[in-house]
Every structure is written in structure tokens, then in C-alpha cells.
């Protein structure tokens, strides 16, 4: 087979480069060793968190001016970096994945799988984030996990919320459709769960959450839904007049795999 361009690396850079070249009419091949970085995607991307001397960066585009001239950001220039980021948002949107860049072009913080706050820049719209680690993420939170799902540790998530000043309550959802998966922890993985959460099962899942809801202003769910179903979960929050947000699970990443396949 003949290709106009062969791209080595299946992460965000390689994926977006391949998409742009294909849209320009080129035949491309994307080569990666094992699973691509998108299989481990948290739902957010860093841009520039620290300078080489360890200084933390609040405004990445401004921080690029302090990088060595040989750094890729310095070579490309901050204006082009921002243009590429906006192009990435449009590309993700074409796959049904809604992402955004902070209005003030500053780093924000996402709640990680381990319950700690991590700096990031480009994030999924429905990912649980905050503009400052010193501000509570909510007044009261409800963290809902699936029975037998070990890749979403509610104790870590709850501690992270409580450390930020947000009281938290955890609940477990038990779905009959997942009974076979629960027999083996190795089968109870995010991608397998996502395939089973079809419309009837998803409605049952939503129904159980509504039963356990007790006026919290934030519902935290594991990021195990297809891009279409995650939109339905956000609609659930609107019906209940509360926010619904997701926290990344341990790999594999359902939204990352869907974007790669898209």
C-alpha cells in the first residue's frame, strides 16, 4: 500500500495531524506501538503546567514566552498553538465530543481518578473541573458507582471532594444487565460496561440514581458512557435541577477510544 504521509504516534498530535491531512486529500497511515495514548485519555489535555525550572504556570500561552527558544512551543509560537487548539475543539466536536478552552486562557483543575486535583487546559465539557483548587467544587455531592466496578474508587473521589470543602455521599448502583460481568473483575471494565449500557439498561441506571438522589447540587459519575449516552446523563441533571459531571476511570478510556474510532 502507498501513502502520502506516514505518522508515527497515535496520541492527540498524531490523530489530529492525520485527520487534517486526510481532509486535505492525502492518504495517511497512523502507526503506534500497542494501544494509542487515546486509550488512556482522562478527558483533558495539559498544555503547559510548569516551566523547566519547576515554576507553576497559570497562563500557559503567556508562560510559553519564558521557554527556551528551541522548545517546540517557542518554535511554533503561542498564536499558532492557540489556533491549533481551537481546531482540535472543532475536530472533537465533529465526533460528538464537546470540549472547550477556558475563556481566560488559564489552566484549570480536574478531579483525577485518584481524587487529586490536576492542572489541565483543554477539557471535555462534562468533566468535573474547577477554576481554583481552593474553591469548593459544590455544596454537596453524590458519587454513584456501579456494583463491582473497581476502576472507579469512590473513596478516593469522595476524599478529593471533601478535601476541597465539598461534603460527599457515595452510593452503589446494581444493574441486572451487568450480572455476568460482575462474575470476573477482569471483565468488569469500562469498555465492556459501555457496550451493555444500551437504552433500556441506561434508563434503569438513571432511575436508580433518581431514587438515591437527596438534593445534592452535584452528581459525580464514572466516565463509562458512550458520547451519546453521556449527553443523556447531562440531561438527567437538567431534569433534576442539578449538575451531573464525570470523573475519568482507570484505563481504558471510553471517550478516548470512541474519538479514535471516529
Regions found by a protein language model. Name each.
Residues 24, 36, 40, 119-261:
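Predominantly flavin-linked oxidoreductase catalytic cores and closely associated redox partners
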Residues 8, 30-32, 99-101, 170-171, ...:
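General beta-strand structural signal in soluble alpha/beta enzymes
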Residues 10, 33, 146:
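Cofactor-binding loop segments of dinucleotide-utilizing enzymes, especially the Rossmann-like FAD-
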Amino acid at each position: 500500500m502507498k501513502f502520502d504521509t506516514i505518522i508515527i504516534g497515535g496520541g492527540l498530535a498524531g490523530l489530529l495531524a492525520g485527520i487534517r491531512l486526510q481532509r486535505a486529500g492525502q492518504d495517511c497511515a497512523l502507526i503506534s506501538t500497542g494501544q494509542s495514548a487515546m486509550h488512556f485519555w482522562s478527558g483533558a489535555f495539559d498544555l503547559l503546567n510548569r516551566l523547566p525550572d519547576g515554576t507553576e504556570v497559570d497562563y500557559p500561552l503567556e508562560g510559553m514566552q519564558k521557554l527556551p527558544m528551541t522548545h517546540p512551543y517557542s518554535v511554533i509560537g503561542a498564536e499558532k498553538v492557540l489556533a491549533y487548539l481551537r481546531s482540535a475543539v472543532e475536530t472533537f466536536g465533529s465526533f460528538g465530543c464537546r470540549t472547550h478552552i477556558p475563556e481566560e486562557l488559564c489552566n484549570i483543575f480536574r478531579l483525577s481518578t485518584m481524587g487529586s486535583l490536576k492542572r489541565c487546559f483543554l477539557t471535555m465539557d462534562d468533566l468535573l473541573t474547577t477554576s481554583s483548587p481552593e474553591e469548593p467544587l459544590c455544596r454537596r455531592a453524590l458519587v454513584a458507582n456501579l456494583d463491582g466496578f473497581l476502576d472507579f474508587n469512590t473513596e478516593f473521589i469522595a476524599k478529593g471532594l471533601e478535601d476541597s470543602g465539598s461534603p460527599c455521599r457515595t452510593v452503589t448502583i446494581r444493574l441486572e444487565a451487568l450480572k455476568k460481568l460482575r462474575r470476573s473483575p477482569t471483565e468488569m471494565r469500562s469498555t465492556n460496561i459501555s457496550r451493555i449500557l444500551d437504552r433500556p439498561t441506561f434508563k434503569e441506571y438513571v432511575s436508580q440514581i433518581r431514587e438515591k438522589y437527596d438534593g445534592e447540587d452535584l452528581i459525580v459519575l464514572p466516565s463509562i458512557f458512550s458520547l451519546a449516552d453521556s449527553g443523556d446523563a447531562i440531561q438527567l441533571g437538567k431534569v433534576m435541577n442539578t449538575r451531573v459531571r464525570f470523573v475519568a476511570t482507570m484505563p481504558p478510556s471510553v471517550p478516548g477510544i470512541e474519538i479514535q474510532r471516529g
